[in-house]
Structure formats: C-alpha cells, structure tokens
Amino acid sequence: MKQRIRIHKAEPNTGVLNYSHLLDAPAGKHGFVEAKKGHLYFEDGTRARFLGFNVAARSNTPDHETADRMAERFASMGVNIIRLHAADAPVGEKPGSWSSCREAPLLDYASGTSRKFNPDGLERFDYFAAKLKEKGIYLHIDLIVARKFEEGDGMEYPGGAPSCIKRYCLYNQRMIELQKEYAKELLCHVNPYTGLALIDDPAVVTIQINNEDTAIKGNMGGDAGEEMKPYRAEVQERFNDFLLMKYHTREHLKEAWTKDGCCALGEEEDPARGTVRGIEGSFYQPVSDPEGEWDAPEGPARYADFMEFGIYMNRKFYQDMKDYIHFLGAKVPVVTSNLIAGAADVYGHTDGDLMENNSYFNHPLLPVENNTYLVAGPMEYVSTNPLTMQTGVGSAATTLLSLGSLAIVKGKPFMLSEWNEYGEHPFHSTAFVQMAAYACLNDWDGLILYNHHTSENWDDQPADEILNVFDVYNDPAVICQWGFMASVFLKGLVSVAKHCVDVIYTQNDLKTLPLFHAMPTTFFPYITSMRNVFLDGGDSYQG
C-alpha cells in the first residue's frame, strides 16, 4: 500500500535529527574565507567545507516569518551554506514559478528598468541573509543569472534582452557596464540587519560573476528574436577581428585553413568584411573530431581558431570583472561561472580564485510552463539506471561525479554549485550519500544541491506531495539522509585518496574536443583523486 510521507519545508528537526551542532554560529566567526593550497580555509587557518542548498528566484525575498523559519530549518539539518541564486529574475504571476514574486522582487522591473532595487525586496533579501548568518549558515552570492535587460536600461541596441540570455553578456560593453553597476549596488549596499555590506561580510564564501555562461556557449534558439540580431552580429564581428589580428589578411587565413588542397574558408568569407562564421555553441562546448571533415561547419581549423578566440574572450571578461569586484573591496574568493565541460571552456574560466561546476543526472529538460517545471510524473519520464546506461552531453558522460570532475583544476578549490539526480528509486535514493562520499575521496570543498524550494512563503507548498521535481524540500531520498550526509562531508568521515592523478592539457589540446575527451573522469574520480592541469608554456609537465 502506498503511503504519503509528510516532510514540511519549514519545520526544524528535533532530537537526534537535529544536526545544528555541525554549525559554528555565527557565520564568519573564523574570519574571511580564503583560497590557498588548492582548498578553502578560514582566515584563522581552519579548513572550510560547505554543504547546502540553492534557493532560487522568488525564494531570495521571503517575508520575515518565512526567513526566520527557513533559517531555523536549515540549521537543524546541518546546512552551512545557502546559494542565494537568481535573485535578479523577472517577476512572475504564478506562485512557485521560477521568477521573482510580484509583492517584493529584488529588482524593480515595474519601473521599466532592471537598474533599480525594489525597496521591499531588498529589505527582505537583507533580512534573510542576516538570519542565515545568525544561525551559522554561509552565503554564496551570484551576480547575473536571470536578469532581463529592459529598454529603459539604456541598451546599445533597440529593445532589451531576454532573461537568462547567454554569451552576449561577455561581449557587449553596455551589458558589462550594467553588470558592474549591479555588482556595486548589491555588494556595497550596507545590510541594516548586519551593519555590513556583503563585500565586507565574512559570512560570504564566494562571489560568482555569472551563472552557466561562457563566450562559446549557445542559446539553443533563445536568441532568435529580432532584438538579438545586433548581439549575434557583434560576436561574429569580434571573431573576425580576432582572425585579422592573428592572420592579418584573408590570404594568410585561407592558407592556414587549407589542408591537402581542401580549404575550410568559404569563398564568401572574408575577415575584413566580417563574414567568417564562428562555431554554434550549445549547453556545453561542442565536440570536434580532429580527424573530421576539414571543410565541415565545425571543421578542425575553424574550430581551433574559434576555441582560441573563446578562451581569449572568456579570460578578458572574467579578468576584468574579477578586478572590478576586488576594486570594490572583495575579500573572499571570486568564481567565474559553472556548467563548464570542454577543455577550452574550463581553461577559459581558470582566472577565478576557485572552480565550480554544475552536474545533473536524469535532468528532465521538460517543456516549461509559466516559467517553471510543473509536470506529471517527471521522475518516471527521466529514469535511467546509471549502472546500466550513461547518457552523454557532447563529450561528457552525465553521471554526477564524472560530469562534475571535468572542471576540477589543480591548485584551485572546487565546489559543485548545483547538482541533483531526478530519477526514481533505488538509484535516486543512493545518489546523494554516494556523492558526498566521493566528494570526500576527491577532497572537494563544497556541495550545493539544487534546489530546496521555490517560494517566498513558508506555508504554501504541500508537505506530502511533490509538485515540482526541482524542489527537494520534501523529497525523502534527500531530506531523510541529509543529516548523515552533512556529518560525512563536513567532518570528512571518508578519507581523502592517498594519490592524485593529474590529467594534462597542452595548449594544442584546447583546440579540439574529441568524443573521448571526458573518458578520464568516468574512471579516475571513482578510485582516487584527480585534477586537471593546463600547461601554459610548452608541453613540459613537472608533476
């Protein structure tokens, strides 16, 4: 007989299930978090590890009662980090939707611009952050995630830009200016409940420049609108400028792109006229067979130059943003982005003080209705047994550990800023403790599960029914094991591997991405620790 299990999202654990003893309140008492020796440490030398949840969109601006209850609930579970994620999302009407609430959004979209804070939303955001800090829960702050650029923002081209648009925020100068403005306003605003700005608060673990973005990422049709046409043209123009800088003339480019009499440069393509096509991206860096068809749309020569260009654009943008955040006074590690898998893409994000990645197994990728995933039977829809089948995204196998490990870089701390498994039991129920154990083996620094809840209220989601597969607040497989997971990971109860395997990339390796690229991550992190090493000068490796 099936029986419903009731798990309320805002009721604190009590008795032996109260894991608040794992926390050391208030957050920040050991000083600012630092990146050193490849890991996160507090200022007083204490090793820092973090396990917690994302709270997305409208969940960032709860009313005071909800903030009090959720902080108490999280602390009782042993949660010591919350990622305040996508607080910049546009307003949505439907309760529980992945959007900001109309009553108190962080950004005042109703004013016709995304450049102003809504006073009520900012006050709620401040209060929530203060209550989390009070309980010993640290903060992961991200900047641009879901922002919808409005025409009133003074955009360079007519119209705005859709929410969650990718790639162009790394290219367009006006978008970059607006990101810096938002960073300054958010990070330097003094929270009246703590007396500190986020930039000065040791309760902040890291500041993430953007979410799931890269100069070589595609939009999967999300940029097809007429208002995005000049942004698409800007990327092509930048690529052609890069080719001219490298080759000087079309003839030199043609010579470089010719092999065995086959030229990859079309007769109509000329970098001086800005007509050389780039590579269309996707969720991840697209694959490229180095022995593939030479004049294919993603042939080896075109691909190699576009990856070199993408690395240049990523590093230029992230170095600039990181310098600006430090100029504002940041004292904690700054991370570039996440959801990165290809070798060139990972290398292009290594200017951050730590590395992060997102990793999912059995991700539904279902159609969105009213800006959220509310579907019947999503777990049944996506269930794949990882013991018998591993799906692939480009060159990457999508088991949690193998996909996450693609972005680990030697000498950098590492966290999963989003991860989850969405299939049915029995493998769903084992995925979470298993991940915590392997994270210990590989000596990772943080695991932030996506997503605890999507609501600004503590009492408007059912305790005994899963309506949104992405909200785990009442998922028995997650919640019933969480305290044990917290003990395992935060205490390091699984020993770190005795040996570490370095996976080496030369600069030439970054110009291609064969299908077997991710093969090392399907094996090494399960038996030992592994890190990626990128050689900046020559091919000599001193291990």
Task: Kindly give the residue locations of the regions a language model identified.
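N-terminal pre-domain segments of enzymes
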Residues: 1-30
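Active-site mouth of glycoside hydrolases
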Residues: 27-323, 327-352
